[in-house]
Amino acid sequence: MTCDLAETSPGGPWYRIGRHPDPWVWPDWSYAGPDGTFGGRFDDPDSSYRVLYAASRPLGAYLETMAWARPDPAVDLDVIAISDPADEDDYAAGLIPRDWIDRRRLGRACAAGTLAAVGHSQSLSRLRGSTAGSMVAHGVAELDAAAIRETAPRAFTQDLGRLVYRCLAADGRTPAYDGIMYASKHGDDVECWALFEGRGDLTDTESLRIDPADSDLAEALRLLRVEIDWA
């Protein structure tokens, strides 16, 4: 089906926090949960493809992956790339141990592709009819920018992600979108990306050691109100 969603392309490099040695490795299917997904916002509910999450700035990557450590009573689990969700249960709220940092790297890569801007007014208008059944099933009253950002029900945004994945170009054969661009719950200024497996192009991938003096890391810690135990 054709979808006619608003689309965009990466205007610069992508960043993500992932496991050492290569933060750009696709998650291993053996780590998928009972529902067949990795818990990501736009993961495939049918477990036929994986999704890689990134941000336009290092700050966004830090915010998304360290949100689990916030001391808030209702911690936000809307993350890009927590490879081991069990970490959330292992560490004290408000404190990130050094070994968590040591086992991860800041990834940088050049990305190319056509991505659906699902929060755009045109996209929301086009998607309302197509997602009606899922909205009813998951108790979503209205498809708006807020619904896309909600942490739960995650199954709804995963249904939406699969719908975008199945959209076709005007020729009726070629996939229309390589992934999704969306705004983070941590702020309108935090631009995030979800890349579908087998789509788009990632080149010049880098794996960088996380620098304790990184200003983006410091800002993320300040905004999240968490600390790293460097001892």
Show the residue positions of the predicted features.
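Extended catalytic/binding region for NAD+/ADP-ribose chemistry, centered on the ART fold
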Residues: 40-73
